[in-house]
Amino acid sequence: MEAQLSLIIMSPEQVLEQCEITYVKLPGKVAPFEVLKGHAPMITTLNSGKVTYQTRDGDVKSLSVKSGFVEIRNNKVSVCVEL
């Protein structure tokens, strides 16, 4: 599967994941949402929940988070979370 987005997930202490992905699902403050290639630029806060993403190899991974924020720009998704 061809990767279409770059993802970096970090906490205040360390980089938790950095990879190429096809999609990511995030626990938005108002409602969960999914980011695909070509998503509009956005910065928003995250609630507690799961960050779920699919790598270019087709593996689906997830990470439980307490809170955080995400910046989406030019097919790059930067997520800063509190675990």
Task: Please state what every model-predicted region is.
Residues E2-L83:
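Compact, glycine-rich, soluble single-domain proteins
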